């Protein structure tokens, strides 16, 4: 097997896609008159488009490459996480969306001040912003890491290219530009996954039936050994618990997803957002896992095509640039770029919305004008993008190891307390501002103890972080002043 040059045609396809994304940003820049337009889309976004955007946002380029690699090297057990995202929809429909819609928020964390006080709001917002600056850096870093052996471009140049493009069209187009580029990117990465699987099927002797027969014989779907309980390994019971809390965090306490609930003009359209996302989640991830199984069978039949000592984390890009036709390979690499950019642009816009609402507007002595809000919003996107890019470059130059485990630990440390605060506020009526602060402190201590003082699997960190807030906040509530009267009954709205 010989790696061939990426080639002019593939580069032309890739840069054609990148230029198209810029044009989308230019188009929607004309609609960004106010901060409401910039962060809420003026309520003009249809539910189905917001749903595709949620799907594209949560399916990063790392998912695009790591899921096939996971199925190639081990099994399909991680698909459980996709279906738990669907299972929590009733919870989101009936308990969370009414609060977010009634308060007419820009930032999800405005709810926490309405329910508790400004301390909870600032903690959650700052945690989100810091986490997503790190997330953007890691997504960029891991994408470049996977692509650089095949594209012949310096990794620092790749980082600058990805980051600069995302900053520009996010800066210009606001949330509308982000969502509509997400729609294009979501369709591209979904279509890319289906196309890759079909093409591998044609290359495998015996086709699709041989792929699934061999995968089953190798016990690479849901191995019986994975059904056991473990405190340290990512077995199926652990994945079910861990992904349940990870999805609750993503869909109830993360600004990049919650922001999609408020860009539509009604609760009906917001629910359509989540239903559209659920339909995509039910179908598309199957193709990513099937790609991994198909590659496993293909390289079993053609072992000479796999370089000795090859890092199987890049198994999908390897197949794309060595086995797929010229032009098609460029399109699929564009899909990987699309998966990265959809997550990055969403993070940048949501960081900006949090800073603008929770820090700048909330802490200003006088109410900022719409023009001032817009200037700050665009400046924050640039600054957050630069910091994320510099962090990604540092990761490349320092050749950091264990970055994925550290990333998942960070999710538990920062995402767990945020999720717990929303759960405490919505489900524990007697919880108050003081008990919420106690819950945050206990949660941080508990997650740090689990991370550095035990061998617990990192999937437990989010569970510990969330439940520590709820338990400590409930127990200590009688020690503080009565809670603000903001309940589910108060959230009733006349929206259709």
UniProtKB/Swiss-Prot annotation:
Known outcome of mutating residue 60 to A: Abolishes Neu5Ac transport
PROSITE patterns, A to Z: NA_SOLUT_SYMP_3
Function: Symporter that uses the Na(+) gradient as the driving force for the uptake of the sialic acid N-acetylneuraminic acid (Neu5Ac). It allows the use of host-derived Neu5Ac as an energy source by P.mirabilis. Also binds N-glycolylneuraminic acid (Neu5Gc) and ketodeoxynonulosonic acid (KDN). Shows the highest affinity for Neu5Ac and Neu5Gc, which commonly occupy the terminal non-reducing position of mammalian cell surface glycoconjugates.
UniProt protein name: Sodium/sialic acid symporter SiaT
The organism of origin for this protein: Proteus mirabilis (strain HI4320)
Catalytic reaction equation(s): N-acetyl-alpha-neuraminate(out) + 2 Na(+)(out) = N-acetyl-alpha-neuraminate(in) + 2 Na(+)(in)
Cytoplasmic side: 30-46, 93-116, 173-174, 253-272, 357-374, 428-432, 480-496
Family: Belongs to the sodium:solute symporter (SSF) (TC 2.A.21) family.
TM regions (residue ranges): 8-29, 47-59, 77-92, 117-144, 155-172, 175-199, 236-252, 273-292, 326-356, 375-396, 404-427, 433-453, 458-479
